[in-house]
From Swiss-Prot:
InterPro entries: Isoprenoid_synthase_dom_sf (IPR008949), Terpene_cyclase-like_1_C (IPR034741), Terpene_cyclase_plant_C1 (IPR044814), Terpene_synth_N (IPR001906), Terpene_synth_N_sf (IPR036965), Terpene_synthase-like (IPR050148), Terpene_synthase_metal-bd (IPR005630), Terpenoid_cyclase/PrenylTrfase (IPR008930). A motif (DDXXD motif) lies at residues 300-304. This is (-)-beta-caryophyllene synthase. It comes from Matricaria chamomilla var. recutita (German chamomile). GO terms for molecular function: (-)-E-beta-caryophyllene synthase activity; magnesium ion binding. Sesquiterpene synthase involved in the biosynthesis of beta-caryophyllene as the major product and trace amounts of alpha-humulene. Produces exclusively the (-)-(E)-beta caryophyllene enantiomer. The Asp-Asp-Xaa-Xaa-Asp/Glu (DDXXD/E) motif is important for the catalytic activity, presumably through binding to Mg(2+). It holds the Pfam family Terpene_synth_C.
Length: 547
């Protein structure tokens, strides 16, 4: 006992959860929801007709793209996946790279989002012969916004998109400033776009933002608007129900009392999983992922902010063994955590076992084992006071970011679309997953470095880079921000060229990167939960949209 009292732990005092037991109880209103679902189903039929009726009329193809854009931004595209794919395939087959309609930027963005590798050459139409952008575009807000959003679907080497981003951002910043008083609604719309482009937004947050904006458009479709509102609230009810289930599971672990050194961020972890997929058909996958992220957060704090080196070695070995028989070797406080990890994987194994997919958990377990090994390597470096080179650091840190583990884990429970080959692909860390890991690692390190320097902790990628290249922290941040933008371009490229993996699986990896952009663009909004994230959670999970 005396020996235990002498142990010096690198403990950190994280702020408690801001939610308490707010989401513990869920009131199910099935009868009322059934009526709403019936209305939604009828309205969906009309939208399907609207999409399909324009296919054979070339003069309507620009309007068709605008309709698809509205459907996507309103958050209801998941109802019309087949119709949208059929429409965009028809447009691609009809025009190839030679789009004849209006709004070429919109055409470019919508098709690239869908996985069609259309050429950016059409955007040269926005330029004069001397290479400058046309003056007429500088005051065309709609055209500027369309081009601005299109630039984020670029890949490495597409200089015209890089030039267009600089041009449109400069013009839009000026317009937003000029319109603050004369047209505050449009000014706010522009500022929201500049703050976070569509390509980096989570679908549910974009729906939340776009629904009131769409309602103010004189050209809005009243039926489409009502469908978006009703559907938003139906999904909110489902997500509340799921969060209630995860909340009760978390309450059973009682992390705040049993593992008080760890961040109590279960609600934020569910928000994270919700960002990866919001659709009803992925409900069980979402619940599992939320639990994994919640425990991964505790694992992170165990290795970073509490566990001593010898304890961490034992825990790492126990995870590699993955058996309840390993539990007796662990310190008392680690037993609850270890059992919690094993239990959620076993539970999911049983859930999907009836479909003959229990073996999918073996891939998820392997990714978790690798994740823990990366933590152990960082603990070893911290214990030895070793500052790795930038290259050494990133090789390990890409895994310790958790995103390669989550990219594999999030496939579990998604249904028949996930094959053994898809899991094997994810474990090879293909370019799109590497890019997502890069975004996660670099954004996290930029904002968490100062907090972590105050305790015994492995040197961050920022510190490794500063030491190796003898540069300032400010310089490293600039370099890392460019690397993050390059990683986004790599994600776009892979979504266009990788045809072996279904787009719904690619979207999970893209959405993981989008969550990072929401949580870490300005600060570590996950560890230090601020008003913005609280507002997001309240809007998505507490307050329904008025009909």
């Amino acid at each position: 006992m005396g020996k235990e009292e002498k142990v010096i732990r690198p403990i950190v005092h994280f702020s408690p959860s801001v939610w308490a037991d707010q989401f513990h109880i869920f009131r199910d209103e099935q009868a009322e929801q059934a009526n709403v679902e019936q209305v939604v189903n009828e309205m969906r039929k009309d939208v399907r007709k609207d999409i399909m009726s324009s296919l054979d009329v070339q003069a309507e193809h620009t309007n068709l793209l605008k309709l698809i854009d509205a459907i996507q931004r309103l958050g209801i595209a998941y109802h019309f996946e087949e119709e949208i794919e059929q429409a965009l395939k028809h447009i691609y087959d009809t025009y190839g790279d030679d789009w004849k309609g209006r709004s070429p930027s919109l055409w470019f963005r919508i098709l690239r989002q869908q996985g069609y590798y259309v050429s950016c050459d059409i955007l040269k139409n926005y330029k004069e012969e001397d290479g400058s952008f046309k003056e007429s575009l500088a005051n065309n807000v709609e055209g500027l916004l369309e081009l601005y959003e299109a630039t984020y679907l670029g890949v490495q080497g597409e200089d015209i998109l890089d030039d267009a981003l600089v041009f449109t951002r400069t013009c839009l910043e000026k317009i937003a400033k000029d319109l603050v008083h004369s047209n505050p609604t449009l000014s706010t719309h522009i500022q929201e776009a500049l703050k976070q482009p569509l390509h980096k937004r989570l679908t549910r947050l974009e729906a939340l933002c776009y629904i009131p904006m769409y309602e103010q458009l004189a050209s809005h479709n009243e039926s489409l608007l009502k469908l978006a509102k009703l559907d938003f609230n139906l999904l909110q009810s489902l997500h509340r129900k799921e969060l209630s289930e995860v909340s009760r599971w978390w309450k059973g672990l009682d992390v705040p009392n049993n593992l008080p050194y760890a961040r109590d961020r279960m609600v934020e972890c569910y928000f994270w999983a919700l960002g990866v997929y919001f659709e009803p058909k992925y409900s069980r996958a979402r619940i599992f992922l939320a639990k994994v992220i919640s425990l991964a957060t505790v694992l992170d704090d165990t290795y970073d902010a509490y566990g001593i080196y010898e304890e961490l070695k034992i825990f790492t070995e126990a995870i590699q063994g993955w058996s309840i028989t390993c539990m007796h070797t662990l310190p008392e406080y680690m037993k609850l955590l270890y059992e919690g990890v094993l239990n959620i994987y076993k539970e999911m194994e049983e859930i999907i076992g009836s479909e003959g997919k229990a073996h999918h958990l073996s891939y998820a377990k392997e990714s978790m084992k690798e994740f823990i090994r990366s933590y152990m390597m960082e603990a070893k470096w911290a214990n030895e006071g070793y500052v790795p080179t930038a290259e050494e650091h990133m090789a390990v840190a890409f895994v310790s970011s958790g995103y390669s583990m989550l990219a594999t884990t999030c496939f579990v429970g998604m249904g028949d679309i996930v094959t053994d080959e898809a899991f094997e692909w994810s474990l090879t860390k293909p370019p799109i997953i590497k890019a997502s890991c890069a975004i996660a690692r670099l954004m996290d390190d930029i904002h968490s470095q100062k907090d972590e320097k105050e305790r015994i902790h492995v040197a961050s990628s920022v510190e490794s880079y500063m030491k190796q290249y003898d540069v300032t922290e400010e310089h490293v941040h600039k370099v890392f921000h460019q690397k993050i933008e390059d990683a986004w371009k790599d994600i776009t490229r892979e979504s266009l060229v990788c045809k072996d993996i279904p787009m719904p699986l690619m979207m999970r990896v893209i959405n993981l990167a989008r969550v990072m952009d929401v949580l870490y663009t300005h600060k570590d909004g996950f560890t230090n939960v601020g008003e913005e994230l609280q507002d997001h959670i309240k809007s998505l999970l507490v307050h329904p949209i008025p009909i």
